[in-house]
Amino acid sequence: MSRKPGEMKVVGRPRRRVDARAKVTGQTRFADDLVLPRMLHCKLLRSPHPHARIRRIDARAALAMPGVKLVLTGADMPIPYGILPVSQDEHALCLSRVRFVGDPVAAVVALDEITASEALDRIQVDFELLRTIADPLEALSTPEPKIQPYGEGNVHKKVALEFGDVDAAMAGADQVFEDVFFYQGNTHLAIEQHAAVGAVDPDGKLTLWSSTQTPHYVHRALARVLEIPAAHIRVIATPNGGGFGGKSDPFNHEIVVAKAALLLGRPVKICLNREEVFYCHRGRHPVTMKLKTGVKNDGSIVAMDLQTLLDGGAYGSYGVASTFYTGALQTVTYQVPRYRFRGCRTFTNKPPCGPKRGHGTPQPRFAQEIQMDKIAVALRLDPARLRQSQLAKPHSLTANYMRIGTIGLSECIDRVVEGSGWKQRYGKLPFGRGIGIACSSYLCGAGLPIYWNTLPHSGVQLQLDRSGRVTAFCGATEIGQGSDDVLANLVAEVLGIDPFDIRLVTGDTDLGPVDLGSYSSRVTLMMGHAAIQAAERARELIAQAVSAKLGIPLSRMVFSDRRVFDAEDPARGFSFAEAVQVGEALHGTLGTTGSYRPPESAAKYKGGGVGPSPAYSYSACVIQVAVQPETGWVDVEKVWIAHDIGRALNPVLARGQVEGSIYMALGEALMEEMDYRRLPRHLSSALVHKFPSMLEYKSPTTLDMPEVITYLIEDPDEAGPYGAKEVGQGPLLPVMPALANALYDAVGIRVDEVPITPEKVLRALGDRTAHRCGPKNFPLIAWPDPLRVPPPWEGGDGKAENEGPRRRREGAIVAPDVVQPGLSPHPSTPEGRREPSGVASPASEMPEVLR
């Protein structure tokens, strides 16, 4: 009953997305559009200091204001939370210490937003100022005061891994290249600001509507912090006006409105303003990198040694994973037989960094692709041909045990080289104009969940009605990337109906099976497999019934054009609605489920959980620039990009994702940065955000976009649904280094950091010796001894030779950060509840609160 790719009616065809009409007519309801009866409004009082103890909070004047219903402080929600089990260091409101300008101290709930905002000014907070840690260098040299009570001083995480004898391989190299790079932090700049609404049902159950990418993880955080059974909480992810990773964490404002709704018995809404979104941040980590690569004279890599230093901000967030990601994927693009990676993440008194499109990988990709260009120049090799000659092998294991499937990168390079006229232009354009190339790879979903378990990563449930309507339920979140469209198209393809015949219920923890969320480019692959499985099971039930009714062999049943019929005699059959009725008569009410869990990783060492993926996508990019030597201005004239998508399920959506990546990448490459400055001494010398608004934080507009030529390269991977791979994040990665390499071709300078501003171009042009702008040195870091993992070609089994015994994990588990009082009482704690693990403040440090 299955179709061959050439016989597909939905998959692979350009189609209008199923939610397009609602969006273009303004009918889509985002979180801030929700208005409920008797709804109250919430605002957060944020710290004006980057690092201070909270000594006293006096909320009496605020509570005395007409219309103010509630003031909350950290003492009302003392249980810590965090997206990673190893970094439970955040609180809904600060308990006893603020750690960056913008950290929330108190919340006001009032009849309207204006009253709530005015009440914030009536709250008096006494602070004891503490030393501010401004950057990673200061964090490394200043262990006290500690920003967080865990970690090594102000170092959050250090990792060290080695795959093969890197030093010996370097000694045998014909040439060794060593460079230092810097990638500035930047933020997501989603059009929609964060918003949430909390409400309590008549039966006492909590519902939270939120502009989140991860309703499942928000659901877990609410159960933990509010200490109510998870089954009594419903999280609904509203359509997102963009996320890009910035809405992947559970956030304090979500917990605050949920708590307020529980206490007041009325709906409570919060919508952050743009400045507050900058404080939420969780964007790109600033990363300093030192990359050392040994090569033979033909350009083949013999070893690579990468060190990274991350500025993590004040909290853990995804930081442990981010640290590993700065080194995990360096081996899946080119052949790297021996590899050493060391990474360090520090705490600083800034808004916390986290995942942004490409999570942790654009920074080292920038370094690797520029150094590949430097290698090509030194060896007098064509940069495009050098890359093509060193590509990783398909269906292979890398040195760090990433399992590669199909690789369409060679064809990607061919297409951009041909389309751009590379051979006629590279090194041949007049001074001031140049062309550059870079490649990249990215994962199609993380191989492990954020909390370890053996449960499916995505589930889909189908309900078939005798009217012919199909309803698909899934926990996946539509954040603008088109996941709802993918779900409808895949189910429609299997059942032979139109995608618009399918009703979608997504992002609702009460109604849909669990999906872990929209991050790591995981949704198409993981939800897609679950959707196909559920649809195939439904098709099987219907086919059995129709086959028996008409006396037709199952092998001849065809589902197409809203009909179920005999392949040899198409007139014999039923409409799809009639076929569902036949199926219901035989089997009873029709409903099926599907689920997906990635295959087991080959990496068995500690830290090997970050990087493995069911499949990897690949991209190649060529950029042409014009540079004004007098001003340093860089104008991007044209972009050619080819992306190995496996199979394009909807080419229109795929092209939109590619071109959206180009837009975001050009902003990172040329202008966007999360920069900070010190206030004057008479204004407390606080470390504050330099550009906390869209007026000053420069980002490209439509007028800044160059012409983009997009090539979708289809090299189907059996790990993906119908061979599909990701397209939402990977195309961003090669853009920044391709632009930097084009700059070198244009005016002969290297700018080894982003953003590449006119000032940096002028600085490099004025450097008569190095013709370069970028960091000169990488700081000395006391690295731990690396875990040594023999690569596969040296007989390795994915385990570290020098790693001690690890805790054995058996079966599916419920992670310990879900607190369910009354369901699992602990006799040694008051009220029979267990004490939560995490970072809490001693009672002696708790501030006095006056209400």
Language-model regions, residue ranges each:
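Intrinsic disorder/low-complexity segments
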Residues: P792-V849
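Helix-loop-helix junctions that connect adjacent transmembrane helices in secondary transporters/permeases
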Residues: P145-L226, L391-R469, L683-Y711
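Thiamine diphosphate
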Residues: R234, P239, G243-G265, K269-L272, ...
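C-terminal catalytic domains of large/alpha subunits in multi-subunit enzymes
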Residues: M65, G74-A75, E227-H232, L262-V268, ...
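Extended active-site and interfacial segments that coordinate phosphate-rich ligands
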Residues: V18-A22, D121-L130, A134, Q213-P215, ...
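Catalytic phosphate/nucleotide-handling subdomain of diverse soluble enzymes
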Residues: A446, Y451-G512
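Flexible, low-hydrophobicity surface segments
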Residues: M1-H156, V176-D179, G447
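Glycine-rich loop/linker segments at domain edges
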Residues: R13, D19-A22, G153-A196, P286-I370, ...
